[in-house]
Regions:
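Long, highly charged, low-complexity intrinsically disordered interaction regions
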Residues: 1-99
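Charged catalytic cores and adjacent phosphate/nucleic-acid-binding surfaces used
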Residues: 2-3, 78-102, 120-125, 131, ...
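Ser/Thr-glycine-rich phosphate-binding loops at phosphate-binding pockets of nucleotides
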Residues: 107-113, 134-138
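Short strand->helix junction
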Residues: 112-114, 299-300
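Positively charged, glycine-rich low-complexity segments
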Residues: 117
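Active-site catalytic microenvironments in core metabolic enzymes, especially phosphate/sugar-handling
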Residues: 177-180, 309
Length: 342
C-alpha cells in the first residue's frame, strides 16, 4: 500500500487477503468482526481507548487485532498487512495474464443468502474494485439445504434486493442468477418461471456424485438441454486438496456435444480445491467447440481474485478467448443467455 490505511480499512484488507489465501474462515471472521466493532465507534472514543491501552475492551477485538489497530492509529501500515500483501497471488503466464485482462466479470458467486460469508453489496463492491463490470449472483437452490439454498420466496426477495443495489451501484451490474442443482433425473431444482427471470443459470451436480457413467451422462445431458441452463458448473465435482473427492464419471464426448449443440458454456471453476474440469477434459471441451465461462465460485470477497487460476488452466488447454463468455460485455452476455437455448 502506498498510503497508511486507517484501522478499519487495515482490518478489512487483512480479512480480504486471508480469503484470497484460503485461510480458515474463523480467522477471516475475527478480522471482519473487529472491523465492524471499530467502525461503530466515534473516532474520539477509539483514540482514547488506544491512548489508555484499552483497545481489547472493544467487543470482538483481541490482542492480534488490537495490535493492527494500534499500528494504524500510530500512522504505520500494520506489519501483518504488509506481510500478506507481499505474499501476493500466483504468477501467471503471459497467455493467462492476457486472458485475465480480457475478462469483464464473473458468472458464479455466492453471498450470505446461501453459504457465502458476505452480503451481496460487499461482494459486488469487491468485484467492482477489481475492475469487473458485472458479477453474477448465483446462490444455491432449495434442495441443497446444507448450503442454505434459496426457496422460491427467498429468491424473489433476493431479486428485489438486486434491483435496489443495481440502482445504487451503476454502472456496475449485479446479474441475477442461481447455481441450481441438477437433480437425479436431470431436472433443475427451481421453479421454471423463476429460472426464466434470471440473467445467468449455472447448473451443477451436488448429490449422488458416484452414479454410474451412463446414468450420470443422461442426467447431465438432460440438464444441459434445459433451455434455462446457461453454464454447466464444476462438471466432475472433484476436490483435489485435503482428503479430496474423486471426479464423477460420465461420457465427456456426449456431454460436451450437448453443450455445443445447445450453446451451453462449460465452466472452468477456479477454486484452488476444484480446478474443474481437469485439463484432459477441458481439452475435450475445447475440441468440441464449447463456450467456456471462467468463474471463481467465490464465497467471500477475496476469493474473487481466483480468476487467474482458471485463466491459467484455460491457457494450458488452448481455450480460444473468443469462446470465453465472461470476456464479453454484459449486454452481449445477456443476449447470449437469453437466446442460446432456443
Amino acid at each position: 500500500m502506498t498510503r497508511v490505511p486507517g484501522p478499519v480499512e487495515a482490518l478489512e484488507r487483512i480479512a480480504y487477503l486471508l480469503e484470497r489465501g484460503r485461510a480458515e474462515s474463523y480467522k477471516v471472521r475475527a478480522f471482519r468482526r473487529a472491523a465492524y466493532a471499530v467502525a461503530a465507534l466515534e473516532p474520539e472514543q477509539l483514540r482514547a481507548l488506544h491512548k489508555s491501552g484499552r483497545l481489547t475492551q472493544i467487543p470482538a477485538v483481541g490482542e492480534t487485532t488490537a495490535k493492527i489497530i494500534s499500528e494504524a492509529l500510530s500512522g504505520e501500515t500494520p506489519g501483518y498487512l504488509l506481510e500478506l500483501e507481499r505474499r501476493g497471488g500466483p504468477a501467471l503466464s503471459e497467455t493467462a495474464s492476457e486472458l485475465r485482462s480480457a475478462l469483464q466479470g464473473d458468472c458464479h458467486s455466492h453471498s450470505d443468502w446461501s453459504d457465502g460469508g458476505s452480503p451481496v453489496r460487499v461482494m459486488a463492491e469487491a468485484a467492482a474494485s477489481l475492475g469487473h463490470a458485472y458479477l453474477a449472483l448465483t446462490d444455491h437452490s432449495p434442495r441443497l439445504t446444507v448450503a442454505n439454498g434459496l426457496d422460491a420466496e427467498r429468491l424473489r426477495r433476493q431479486l428485489e434486493l438486486v434491483d435496489q443495489l443495481n440502482a445504487e451501484l451503476a454502472p456496475f451490474r449485479i446479474l441475477t442468477g442461481i447455481e441450481v442443482d441438477i437433480l437425479e433425473d436431470g431436472t433443475l431444482d427451481q421453479e421454471e418461471h423463476l429460472l426464466s427471470r434470471l440473467d445467468v443459470v449455472v447448473a451443477s451436480v451436488h448429490s449422488k456424485l458416484r452414479m454410474e457413467s451412463p446414468e450420470m451422462t443422461r442426467r447431465m445431458v438432460r440438464a444441459i438441454e434445459n433451455p434455462h441452463t446457461d453454464i454447466l458448473g464444476h462438471c466432475t465435482g472433484r476436490i483435489i486438496v485435503g482428503r479430496g473427492r474423486k471426479p464423477s464419471t460420465f461420457d465427456p464426448e456426449k456431454v460436451f456435444a450437448a453443450c455445443t449443440r445447445t450453446g451451453t458454456a462449460v465452466e472452468i471453476n477456479s477454486r484452488p480445491e476444484r480446478r474443474d474440469p481437469p485439463l484432459e477434459l477441458l481439452r475435450l471441451a475445447v475440441g468440441a467447440g464449447c463456450y467456456v465461462s471462467i468463474d471463481t465460485d467465490a464465497h467471500a470477497p477475496g476469493q474473487l481474485e481466483w480468476l487467474g487460476l482458471g485463466c491459467e488452466q484455460a491457457a494450458e488447454a488452448g481455450v480460444d478467448p473468443v469462446k470465453v463468455v465472461n470476456a464479453w460485455d454484459a449486454d452481449r452476455l445477456l443476449a447470449w443467455t437469453a437466446s442460446h437455448g432456443s
